[in-house]
Every structure is written in structure tokens, then in C-alpha cells.
């Protein structure tokens, strides 16, 4: 059993990972500034897990609160989700993203070292591959040219953590590059909070389904794919959460930098996602095909074989379950955690 600090632990992926950690017998402390989440998730996490979870409201750039957390809790490892994640916003406000995502991660690493904690699992992204020109994506591909400050911030943090580990071999840096997380916890109690216009496909579909938006915009119908729409590797958020736990358990005591893809190894198109959601919900999702967005790729997906060999993890939940769990969450919580 380990005591894990989860930064961004009330966010979408962070909250589901908290559930997985507790289910696996670990203890958890959450740090979150609630800029993209809700305090109302905490009683729901208690309902799911049966445990009161220590929570600190604060920012990873705040050294004082980090020092207080490390002084008051015997932390063994950190799973680091805290960061801004809207691609479009990052293009408009790059300084905000580099300050939060890059400077924040550096402050966190410095305070971990000060406290004698040398194990971190970092929430990275497949965006660090850029456009390598071939699929599937494998961990030995070089870092690519990212298409947004969001993606660049993830790539920069990967480089920073890798350099820190080279200089100080006590560190275990676990860099998890994940693809497109969707779905929700099977209880319907936690899921993705619908704040504003969604950046990702499934939350957009869910807002149309719940009547918050009139129709779905499908960007690009002329890609070189079977139905002309973009294809992505979708992964159930609980599979993703379990991947974080598996990586932490397998590698947190193994010094080095560990790069791992977290994906299913399968690509699904936008129209396939729409049809799967319609099948799960019994609804019809109106959509309009619009021009491609700049920087969007036709198709990408993970090669998950290295990850399976390293930590014994692979996805368990199929597209139908992703849709069923998403629809349960949305239909039970049309306003997210504000109900």
C-alpha cells in the first residue's frame, strides 16, 4: 500500500484514478484548485469508495501548500494531472498554459525532491508525437512538432522530467501518453463536467443529447478514412485510471524514465461514435459536417503492446460500454456536478 498525492484529483481523469487507487488498497491525498472541476465531487467519491479523502484546495505553483501537504502526509508517490487542457484556449492564451502546465510541474518536482519523494506519474498526451506520418504510434517514435501550446506544454514537461532523472538517478519518471478518454464510472456518480462548449467529441455529443446544444459539428467529412471522418483511439476513463495504478505499482520503485502509451490500439471514426452513442441512448444525434479544422489528423491510434509487456495492463471495456456509461452519467446529471 502506498500513499499517493493526486494533483488535479477532482478533474475528469483524476477523480476516476482516485477511485481506482482506493479500490487497489492505496491511500490518496487530493490537491486541486477547482479551476476546471467541482467541490461537489468529493461526497460522490466518498459514496463510491466508502472513504473520506483528504483534500487540499490549492495550486501546484503554490510552494507553501505543497510543503504543507508533504509535511502533513507521508507521500510515497505523486500522480500529476493538474494542468489546463483546452487546445483552442492554449492557442489564444499560450502564456497561461506555459505558466500552469510547465512552471507548475517544475515547482511540483522541486518540492517533491525537497520532501524526498522521487516518484511521479505524469499525465502526458499522444499530442507529443505530432504527426509522425504513420500509425500506430509507438513509444520509440521521436517527439514531434506539436500543433498547440497545450501539446507543446506536455512535450516540454516530458523533456524536463527526463532531464531531471538523468541528473538525479533516484527518480522514477513515469510518462503516460494517452489517447482519447471517454466514458464515466459505472455508478453514474462521476464523469466529465460539461463546462462551456466542449473541446472533445463525446462531451459535445452528450450536450446535444441533453438539449444543451442544438446539433453536433463534425469537422471534416473528406478524410482518407472508410467513412470520411476523423478516426481516434478511444479509451474508457476507468481503463485509463487502472493504467495509472498499474504503471505506478510496476514502476514507481524502478529508477529511470518510463514512457508508456495508454490506448486501445483501435481507431473509431466520428460517425462510428455517433452511431454507438445513439445505440446506447436510443436517441438520434443531429449533426452537420463542416470543413476540417487546421491541425487535425485523419487517423491515429496507439500500439499498446509495449505497455502490456511492461506493466501487464490493457484495455478491458469496449465502445458500447463507453457509450452506456457516458449516457448514464449525462442522463443522471444533465448539469454535471451542479445538480
UniProtKB/Swiss-Prot annotation:
Pfam families xrefs: Epimerase
Active-site residues (renumbered): 150 (proton acceptor)
This enzyme's EC code(s): 5.1.3.2
Origin superkingdom: Bacteria
Names of the cofactor(s): NAD(+)
Catalytic function, reaction form: UDP-alpha-D-glucose = UDP-alpha-D-galactose
Class of enzymatic activity (EC top level): isomerase
Ligand binding (substrate): 125, 150, 180, 200-201, 217-219, 232, 293-296
Pathway the protein takes part in: Carbohydrate metabolism; galactose metabolism
GO BP annotation list: galactose metabolic process
Oligomer and partners: Homodimer.
Protein name: UDP-glucose 4-epimerase
Naturally occurring in which organism (per UniProt): Neisseria meningitidis serogroup A / serotype 4A (strain DSM 15465 / Z2491)
